[in-house]
Structure formats: C-alpha cells, structure tokens
Amino acid sequence: ARARRHGLTTGEGATAEGTAAEGAVPAAFRPMLAALTERANDASTAVVDMDPKGDGTTVSMTLTWAELNQQVNAAATRLHALGVRPGDRVNLMVPPGARLTTLIYACMKLGAVIVVADTGLGIPGLTRALKGANPSFLVGIPAALSAARTLLWPGVRISVEPLGSVQEKLLGVAGSVFTAPAADGTPGAPVPTPTVVEFPSPVPDADAAVLYTSGSTGPAKGVVYTQRQLAGMRDAIANTYGFAPGSGLVAGFAPFALLGPALGATSVTPTMDVTRPKTLTASALASAAAAIDASVVFASPAALVNVVATADELNAEQRAALAKVQTVLSAGAPIPVPLLEALSALVPNASLHTPYGMTEGLPVTDVSFEMIRQAIAEGTPNAAGEVLDPFARDGVCVGFAVYGAAVAIAPLLQDGSVADELTHEPGVTGEILVSAPHVKDRYDTLWVTEEQSISTPGWHHTGDVGHLDASGRLWVEGRLAHVLLTSQGVLTPVAAEQSAESLPEVRRAALVAVGPAGTAAPVLVIEASANTAALEARQSASGLKRALLDRVPGARRFPIAEGVAPFELSQLVRQKVAEDTGVELAAVLVVHEHPTDIRHNSKIDRPALGEWASKVLAGA
C-alpha cells in the first residue's frame, strides 16, 4: 500500500512473542539519577542557559555538576516541605533550562511523578490534558499560575520564584521553590529548608513521568513512563549515539535537554520559542554549541529549515563551533534530502541522523544520511537498468531498530484495517509495530486506546504505516489514519508526496482523499513555498535555459492564489506522480502553507486539508 496501486498480502511472520523477545536487551536497572550522584563533586559544567531575552548569543546561567546536584537536593527538600510525596503528580510549567532541569530531577529524587504538558498543545488542549492527568501540584512561572487560577487547572500552586504577598494571595500560591534573583541578576537558589529529608530509593516499576503526544492526530494523549522505561530511553540513546561523560548536547527540542544529566552530558537549550521550533536561528544554535563545545545537536526538521535559511548570519567563531559538532539528530517529521545536504555544509564533520520514534517510544529506529543515500541508490535503476532492492523506495527510510528495540509489520488489508499476524517480509505494507524496553507503560486514563495499542501481546501499535526493504530497513509511508481508500485501491500518502516534492515548483505536499471511503478520489494539496514562478519560467524558456531551470530548486517564484492549481502546474504534478507511483490524481490544489502541529511545526494536519479540499472541489 505504498502511494500507488498495490497488491496487498497478509504475509507470514514470526509470532508476536517470539519476535518481540529478539529485540530485548536484559540489563540491570540504573536509576536516572545515577550519573548526577556519581558526579556530585564534579566541578565541570553540567547545564548552561542562554539569555532568553537577547539574541541567543550570550550565556545567562551555568551550573556545574556539583552545583546541579546541590540544587536538586535542595529543591527536593523544599518541595517536600511544601507537601510533595512519593507518587504525587507534579505538573511542571517552567520554560526549558536549568530551572526546569533542577525541578525534574528534584521530583525524581522524591519519587514524585512529573507531568509535562507543553504549551504547544494550546489552551484547550492543555486544559484537557491537565484535567485528565489531575496532578496534585503545579509548579510554574507567574503566567502559568495565573492561567491555572483562571482555567481551574488542578494542583496546589507553587511558584518558581517568590511573588509579592498580594500576588501570592490572588493566585492562591502555597510558596516558592527558589529565592528571588540577586541585584546583579544572578538567579536565586532553592529556598533553604532546615528539615533533613531521607530520599527514597528509586523503585524501577513506579510511575516516573506523564508525557503528552503532540495532538497532531487527535487530542493529546498522556503517556505514562516508569522509572525503568525512562532509564531504558536513556540507555537506547546512549548506546545508539555513543553518549559518554563529557559529551555536549545542544537540545533544540526541549525534552532532550532534560535527558542531559541522566546521560552524563553537558546540556544547553538554544534561545528560541519552544512552541515554535522554526524560530531557532543558525546564530542561536551556533552560540549554544560554542557555549558547551557541543558534540551533539538535536533539533526538529522545522527548526533546521530556519537554521539553514539564516546561515548567512554566522560569523567565523560560530561556524567553527558548528564544525566541532559530531552528530546531528532530527525527528518529528520526514526530512527532505536537500535539507540534509544543506545542513551538511553547516556541520561538515557531523554524522546526520534522522531517528524514528514517537512520544510512546523514542528512538525506535535510526538512520544516517549516508545510509539514506545508500538505500535510495539501491532502489534506483543503475546504468544497466537494474534495481538492487525494489523495496528500497516509496516512503521515508528510517533505518534499522536501535539498541534493545524490534520492529514488525501488521499487513494492511483491502478495507484499510490491519491483519492480526505479523511479518518481516520485504515490501509488505502495513501498520508498524514496535517492542522495546523504553516503550511506554500505558496511556493515562485512556483504557480503550491502551487496549488497542497493545492488542498484539508484547508490541505497541504505532498507528504509522510502512514496509521493510530487502535489507531489513524500515520505510515509513504515513499514518494509518491517513491511508486513502480510493477507486484505485488502498493508497498510502508519502510516496506521492515525495514525488511531487521533487519538483522545484513544490515545497511540500499532502495527499488527501475526497469522497466516500472505497471510491474516494486522491487529491494532492501542495504548498507552493514562495510560490511558483518556476513553472512560468519553464514555460517561457527553451533549450538549455529550460533544462537548467528544471534543475534549480530556487528558480524564481512568486505567489499564486490558493485553491485549484493553475492548469500547467496541475499537469506537471499529475504527470510526475503518475510516472513515479502509478497514482492518477483527481486534482491538484494549492495552499500558501499547510496546517501543522505546534510542537514540531512539521506534522501536516491532513484531515483539515481533506475537509478544505472537499469544499474547494465542491465549489463552496
């Protein structure tokens, strides 16, 4: 069910229990706090904050490992004095940085359960999430405390820093964790507490965190992790990417910064609006890298797009800092090869990786840019017209399962449902199932969703669709919810989208269905980036000039109206998609910008586009 007509098979594979066991890596439980405890007397840098009010080029706060350990213990003692006990849920509404890192590890020290529902969910989504999680405490900045009072968010309210007595009374605040900043702006320390607290030993299978999905495929879901599963995530990342004490991590995706202390890595979050990843600039990223002599960078695809777009602002020192980076990780949405190529020029000595995973388990697979190139070459006819691997195509290559993980396919059936049995047969499209020590414990208070996700014992149903190639690499073809049941058969969206995106006139594309399931028409909605004069340039050119324009992704562009695409553009896209995938498009529509999720700014809201496309084609 790649994005062309498919002969679908159910396939025969190993049993769920047998295959899941293959990926498991038994290991002794190492608590998330282990590295912090071991480095309690280490005077080297643990956490760095960049100035959030400036241009992202200056450091505002630095904590050594010894200082971080002291602050975590002091903050845990203060939270205990304010009533936090083992098992209590604590909602942390604090911007990424040293403060949030300290609070997270303080909660772990107490055996409390952190609730992380980011503001990227929007106010309605955030309210729904928090009322579902029902935390006992809410630790936040004034804006969060004010929202909590107005929107009746649950939990005893605790301020990060002291508020005036009037404001404390107005917001119903029980106290603060940290003292006020000093006159010179130096951040305050945890409020001194005379009580001596005996911290509990970590319980491996006790709840540790409730994290929330992005809400890009429906209401955000709370995902519960135990101490053991968080440690498994840390171990998967450490073993896959070679993290070691002394590694420097620039986290353009905030959750990864929080893993820094557990990995034994020095971490920094670059200056950016965390709810809008595409606000990350090359200068801010490079300055953050320079601040910790970074070896690893993690950023979302949308963030990297803007980093590449603003690269001309870099000075020699910033370019030198990026040249020291050894690994770049990016996940959350497919990353086009041209973006990876442009990024390579900024980090010339780095290996680029695009891991696949989800809130329920990250990472699941990993692939390097070199492996992507190799896979594409194997799926492309050579000079003799031979194809080494006919299944190395029609999707996004995300590589092989990471340390401790296993992947299998539940074949897609003609009605869009999936088969019960699993397979590893190359070329069979179906739902992607994963098994790993770091996959979630359960969905929070979503019992039906949880039962569906674990309906195959030992496996998590991801809701993504894809296939394996002859080498065992995984190729993602889209979301199960976005599979199209058309008159041409069952189609998955990614291959047709990739085909259209290979044209210089198309920045981004989304395949949607218009009409009843089973007889729906495939419609491609393209984003005409700074929209497409490349087409008009091609029409007016000839010979060598026309051939050159065909090769230039940035050929002159200017806006065109949203709605049905101009005839010439439509024909160009239809022909390309038909040649590459066999899919006959019913229509090509144009939008200035696709609707995307807030967290990554990358995941396209295809249901919304489908509704819009139906109205446009109906003349509404």
Predicted regions and their residues:
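Conserved AMP-binding/adenylate-forming
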Residues: 326, 341-355, 359-466, 470-471, ...
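Structural core segment of the AMP-binding/adenylate-forming
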Residues: 1-4, 8, 82, 110-181, ...
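Conserved pre-ATP/AMP-binding loop-to-beta segment of ANL
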Residues: 43-45, 180-212, 219, 243-247
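Conserved AMP-binding/adenylation subdomain of ANL enzymes
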Residues: 112-113, 231-248, 254-296, 310
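Conserved C-terminal "lid"/linker of ANL adenylate-forming enzymes
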Residues: 484, 510-512, 562-563, 570-620
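Conserved AMP-binding A3 loop
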Residues: 62-66, 200-202, 208-235, 266
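Conserved AMP-binding/adenylate-forming core of the ANL superfamily
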Residues: 46-83, 88, 94-97, 101, ...
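AMP-binding/adenylate-forming catalytic core of the ANL superfamily
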Residues: 138, 297, 436, 441-442, ...
